[in-house]
């Protein structure tokens, strides 16, 4: 097969197989072709991963932070050296255009490893003077952390979660999405090549039952999930029973607000980036595009013109700008939302169908879609679609659009396009969302935290904040005089 790995799992520094597990076929979304055959983790595989992690974690945490950081930075170098190879693997696994995976996947993973490897030696506790005595705090590792990944950015998510965890001295067990299991194994090999001690980064494959087993395992100190809100609720409930630490990066239905003084081409570019990149399969996408009534017609006319020029096709052709959705089930789901949008009265401005592509008739492709005349109560304006479907809504004034933007159970992201930066800051200050942009959209440098409000999540990925989520604070009080006791 095109992308068959050495084995399904990576445990204790080596590939491991157990064919007693449930078969896990890997499908190339552009052709519906099976490119690899793996097996879901058995209880024995899961226990082996925990045994390896437990054995390695203590010595790793005892290393100087600068020594841990050096290995992470070397891993980043290896990923960059192998970027093209890894990008091709990610394109096979996800169907995303190679044009995109070359710059957004392994490259972002390398950025995370480099960032956390560089800052960990300066991530220290506090010193508090208390007169004749003093106190200090220590940031200590949690132990064994679990990451559960999504299928839109497999290697990026694996690195975004494991880099801060490992930097802090934890061991890590990662379960990729069953749809995209391959690149996490490649990341494990890169860690090994960089000198990461065996057992610190383990990959176990599987379906939801494997994820549940990891969450519920007695040795799991923390769970970090990237996934849907329903999955997040289940994992929160499971983790809560044992008071485990959690980070939840969940779904969104984010607003992107375009005022009438905005640079039109820039705003349209931001809206397209925030709806069509990765074939619309991005949790932070600004799928509710609020456009001021004064520029609505010009905005939609130019948006449709540019959207129709998006090149859909062979993901390995570097001129291709959009590949397929991840699966037939996901395409069917997106098409059902398009049907619902039309039925509820939205105007289909462009797209909405399945393109005919020579040689890719079995692929899970869909046209980038724009709806106009969308109202706040329509299903396509309320629910996360996770596909290339943009809803354009009209607004008249600032207070109105702020209220409408906030009228959602989600709060992952938001964007504002305006020439008036004072207004931009004011509006963003009123929006209930965790990750926001002014005159940009969906740019996520690893140096800054990423995460949401409300039903969109708990905790943060990236930035110094991520290190806090993979550590616990120990307070030490030091008495320099005699104990003052009433006894």
UniProtKB/Swiss-Prot annotation:
Top-level EC class: oxidoreductase
UniProt-listed Enzyme Commission number(s): 1.2.1.8
Residue numbers of Cysteine sulfenic acid (-SOH) PTMs: 283
CDD domains for this protein: ALDH_F9_TMBADH (cd07090)
Cofactor(s) needed for function: K(+)
Active-site residues, record numbering mapped to chain: 161, 249, 283, 461
Domain of life: Bacteria
InterPro entries given in the database record: Ald_DH/histidinol_DH, Ald_DH_C, Ald_DH_CS_CYS, Ald_DH_CS_GLU, Ald_DH_N, Aldehyde_DH_dom, BADH
Residues that, per the record, bind K(+) 2: 243, 454, 457
Binding site for NAD(+): 149-151, 175-178, 228-231, 251, 283, 384
Keywords (A to Z) from UniProt: Metal-binding, NAD, NADP, Oxidation, Oxidoreductase, Potassium
Catalytic activity, as annotated: betaine aldehyde + NAD(+) + H2O = glycine betaine + NADH + 2 H(+)
GO MF term list: betaine-aldehyde dehydrogenase (NAD+) activity; metal ion binding
GO BP terms, alphabetized: glycine betaine biosynthetic process from choline
Co-factor remark: Binds 2 potassium ions per subunit.
UniProt-annotated binding residues for K(+) 1: 27, 93
The protein's assembly and partners: Dimer of dimers.
HAMAP family linked to this entry: BADH
Reported function: Involved in the biosynthesis of the osmoprotectant glycine betaine. Catalyzes the irreversible oxidation of betaine aldehyde to the corresponding acid.
Name this protein carries in UniProt: Betaine aldehyde dehydrogenase
Gene: betB
